[in-house]
Amino acid sequence: MPQRDLNHLFVVTYGRSGSTLLMGVLNTIPGFLIRGENRDALHHLYRFHSTMLAESNRGPKRKLNQPTHPFFGIAGFPAQKSLRQIRRLATDTVLRPDEDTRVTGFKEIRWYQQDLEEYVAWLQQVFPSARFLVNTRNHEDVLKSKWWAEGEDKSEHLADIERRILTLAESLGDAAYRVHYDDYVADPVALRGMFEWLGEPFDEATVRETMAVRHSI
């Protein structure tokens, strides 16, 4: 069965940033289905693909194709087929779009891996034309919340995560857009620019209604 022509949107953020509320707002848009977190599950698929790709180029293909070689057959790793099949796997098991879904994706708070840039570049290979929505929040409020407040001070860790995802957003150009929780909670109209970036009409009444409902419960 041919894969559907879907657009993809990924929310890039950190824990306790209000991203569940943002997910709720995005899902008010007709045809949008943005899933919640998956504990960075796709990163394991990235590591599989990148490992196989690197090992398939570990030496001359003539030697790697010899049945006496320890890595016999690895040179035949079909990189493009791997990308297609990973896209199908993620679509069928993680995203699970509805019949009327036009844009799908997920929000994730675990973007702190050291290979962040390489991982996102790979996501763009798996999901061509994917876009990335970066969500931030006032650090003082984040650090007071839940596990951020437990144990030793985590302010430097939070600052480093935000610095990296903002640098990522800048490197992605028009494929990325930034929103700030404190701005759109204070005034939902602050999200108008996000809707314009998405190419979708801004329904202020629906956004306000959604934001009046408690999320992340």
Residue locations for each model-derived region?
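PAPS-dependent sulfotransferase catalytic core
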Residues: M1-L89, E204-T206, T210-I217
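PAPS-dependent sulfotransferase catalytic domain
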Residues: R47, T51-P60, P97-E204
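Domain-wide signal for the mature, well-folded portions of proteins, strongly enriched
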Residues: T91-P97
